[in-house]
């Protein structure tokens, strides 16, 4: 992986060794698939060798990126690796977080209610960067997001809309009265009061820096001035969290000497046929770091579908996707907004095609096969594990298994009176004997259950499907269909289809990408303008295109509200 080496741009081996009289900042620009994480890992190891394991601080926008770096077996303590919010939270002594304590606010402000956040989720960057056009929470959530955006861009209050200023005053009063800091305060107070980065590092690394807003990058740079040097790893072309206040300018300004900029130019993901349209698209933006960026040496394909829109994905789109899945390829379906994926999800469910979104595990709509104690797939596996057709790993039921799948059965005609109350009292790890079953089930239901063991495992699935309670009937259909069509292990196997918004899969890749070019009304208004609003839309679709390793399908737009790709 080579950077520019033409005498102007810097090279990876020079990091930390250049003249620091102007700045100690280095920037690594990593276009899609160029191995930014690999290079950053190498730089962290170099810094540890030079300064020691206690002299390095690594920060990233999200916990997912921090975890990816941590997974590279870095020679630093886990508490030196985390999101910027997490580092600030600990540096400020672990204050109470306002977004986690909104009960009083919701009582006093019924028209501006907020959804309480989980502290660790937000500190880990989990809900930062939810998609534009996604289903927002309550009215107060929207107001707080707007306020945080204006603050993050470091625009003085007199430049804010009046409604944001008014909300800001009430929110500040609430925080002061209850001794709380919100997530934006963590950065703002650290910028004001914490002069040196936590643990006094000699070298600071900021990954995913294009996702940080001006205030966050100002803090990194303030801390960086007191380090020997610091590295900002980013791709300004992938700045797509504009709704959190992230802008390319925050990364690109102030300018730094050319020999402090390193550009990773060789993509190991994007083939020529995808690279061409992606570059034509991104070159339309008004502000970017010019990059010499090369496709991987493979032709690939860019196919424009003549029919099949997000509202009618069944035939051309899903049929071709099935052909790719049969060849063992991974497939990703991407749209600008969550609502555009609803018809597709309905078709995937109807056809029993397993799908997930590993980048947004908290979204149940995109992850209907999530495992976990009490989840539908775990109950179905607990049911099937004793059947001779289960295959490897077949074993007799334990009382714990029995409790999982029997809990959702309807009582009438199936379970004896009081059976559900008995279930939790059985020792969970003991085998469920025929005597146990006889004590729980009505005779006819038990006979039908035992008969299923003489046939295919699907007959056991059908026995359960017909007897679950009405309250869970709808919920169990898709996982049951998956097990029926593909076998029990399909509930455990990682699905080869990913469904999500472009925002949700940033950093991800698949062999084949289906990209819906449609825009919401708001995004279309942005796209029709010039400058930053239009640029934000273009960058979003550039990110969508460049997830593809082999082939991208540009689907038919549903209307004229679309991006020209």
What residues fall within each predicted segment?
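Conserved interdomain hinge at the start of the Helicase C-terminal
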Residues: 308-329
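Core RecA-like ATPase module of SF1/SF2 helicases and allied nucleic-acid translocases
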Residues: 34, 63, 86, 272-275, ...
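ATP-hydrolysis module of ASCE/P-loop NTPase motor domains
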Residues: 96-176, 393-432
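Accessory N-terminal region flanking or inserted into the helicase ATPase core
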Residues: 2-30, 38-39, 55, 122-205, ...
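Conserved two-lobed SF2 helicase motor
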Residues: 83, 182-186, 190, 495-503
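Conserved helicase motor core of SF1/SF2 NTP-dependent helicases
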Residues: 28-34, 38, 61-64, 203-206, ...
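Conserved P-loop NTPase-based nucleic-acid remodeling module centered on helicase motor cores
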Residues: 55, 60-143, 351, 357-363
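P-loop NTPase Walker
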Residues: 1-97, 500, 505-506, 543-546
């Amino acid at each position: 992986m080579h950077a520019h080496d033409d005498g102007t741009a810097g090279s990876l081996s020079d990091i930390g060794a250049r003249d620091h009289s102007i700045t100690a900042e280095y920037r690594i620009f990593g276009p899609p698939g160029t191995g930014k994480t690999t290079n950053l890992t190498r730089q962290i190891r170099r810094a540890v060798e030079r300064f020691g394991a206690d002299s390095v601080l690594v920060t990233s926008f999200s916990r997912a990126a921090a975890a990816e770096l941590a997974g590279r077996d870095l020679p630093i303590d886990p508490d030196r690796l985390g999101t910027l919010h997490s580092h600030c939270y600990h540096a400020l002594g672990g204050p109470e977080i306002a977004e986690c304590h909104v009960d009083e606010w919701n009582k006093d402000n019924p028209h501006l209610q907020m959804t309480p956040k989980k502290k660790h989720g937000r500190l880990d960057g989990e809900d930062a960067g939810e998609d534009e056009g996604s289903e927002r929470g309550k009215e107060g959530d929207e107001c707080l997001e707007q306020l945080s955006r204006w603050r993050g861009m470091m625009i003085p209050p007199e430049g804010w809309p009046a409604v944001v200023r008014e909300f800001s005053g009430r929110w500040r009063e609430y925080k002061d009265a209850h001794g709380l800091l919100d997530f934006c305060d963590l950065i703002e107070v650290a910028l004001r009061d914490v002069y040196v980065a936590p643990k006094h590092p000699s070298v600071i690394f900021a990954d995913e820096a294009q996702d940080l807003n001006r205030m966050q990058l100002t803090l990194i740079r303030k801390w960086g001035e007191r380090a020997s040097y610091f590295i900002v790893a980013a791709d300004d072309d992938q700045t797509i969290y504009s709704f959190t206040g992230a802008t390319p300018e925050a990364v690109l300004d102030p300018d730094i000497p050319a020999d402090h900029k390193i550009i990773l130019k060789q993509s190991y993901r994007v083939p020529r046929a995808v690279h061409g349209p992606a570059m034509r698209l991104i070159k339309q933006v008004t502000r970017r770091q010019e990059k010499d960026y090369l496709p991987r040496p493979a032709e690939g394909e860019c196919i424009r579908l003549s029919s099949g829109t997000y509202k009618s994905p069944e035939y051309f789109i899903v049929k071709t996707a099935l052909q790719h899945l049969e060849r063992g390829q991974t497939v990703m379906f991407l749209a600008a907004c969550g609502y555009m994926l609803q018809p597709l999800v309905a078709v995937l469910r109807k056809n029993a095609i397993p799908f997930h979104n590993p980048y947004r595990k908290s979204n149940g709509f995109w992850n209907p096969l999530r495992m976990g104690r009490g989840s539908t797939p775990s109950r179905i596996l607990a049911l099937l594990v004793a059947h001779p057709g289960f295959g490897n790993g077949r074993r007799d039921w334990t009382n714990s298994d029995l409790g999982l799948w029997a809990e959702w059965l309807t009582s009438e005609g199936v379970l004896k009176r009081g059976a559900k109350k008995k279930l939790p009292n059985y020792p969970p790890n003991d085998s469920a004997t025929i005597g146990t079953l006889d004590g729980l089930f009505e005779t006819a239901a038990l006979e039908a259950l035992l008969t299923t063991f003489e046939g295919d495992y699907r007959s056991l699935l059908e026995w359960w499907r017909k007897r679950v309670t009405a309250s869970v009937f709808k919920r169990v259909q898709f996982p049951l269909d998956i097990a029926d069509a593909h076998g029990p292990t399909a509930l455990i196997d990682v699905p080869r289809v990913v469904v999500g918004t472009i925002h949700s899969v940033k950093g991800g890749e698949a062999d084949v990408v289906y990209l819906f070019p449609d825009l919401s009304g708001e995004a279309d208004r942005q796209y029709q303008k010039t400058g930053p609003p239009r640029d934000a839309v273009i960058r979003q679709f550039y990110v969508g295109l460049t997830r593809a390793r082999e082939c991208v399908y540009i689907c038919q737009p549903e209307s004229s509200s679309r991006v020209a790709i």
